């Protein structure tokens, strides 16, 4: 339990930041799912546009350390590989 005023304030700030970070992580997951959904539908153009949007979200989240930068790089790499494979198979 926070006893000092400073500790109480930090607890309030952490709660607020936790909620914001959770929404940012959710946005990352939603963006990735949108790409995977368009890949399953074999829609190359939709996957490309969703990928460009997801890259922005991933880079912002990684820059703010909401997700690890290596995880963002890994996701971008794997998703671009899947899009490339879809484009080459069509």
From Swiss-Prot:
Keywords: Ribonucleoprotein, Ribosomal protein, RNA-binding, rRNA-binding. Residues 1-27 are annotated as: Disordered. GO terms for cellular component: cytosol; small ribosomal subunit. One of its GO terms (molecular function) is structural constituent of ribosome. Pfam families: Ribosomal_S20p. InterPro entries: Ribosomal_bS20 (IPR002583), Ribosomal_bS20_sf (IPR036510). The keyword Ribosomal protein applies. GO terms for biological process: translation. It comes from the Bacteria. PANTHER family: 30S RIBOSOMAL PROTEIN S20 (PTHR33398), SMALL RIBOSOMAL SUBUNIT PROTEIN BS20C (PTHR33398:SF1). Binds directly to 16S ribosomal RNA. Belongs to the bacterial ribosomal protein bS20 family. This is Small ribosomal subunit protein bS20. It comes from Coxiella burnetii (strain RSA 493 / Nine Mile phase I). The gene is rpsT.
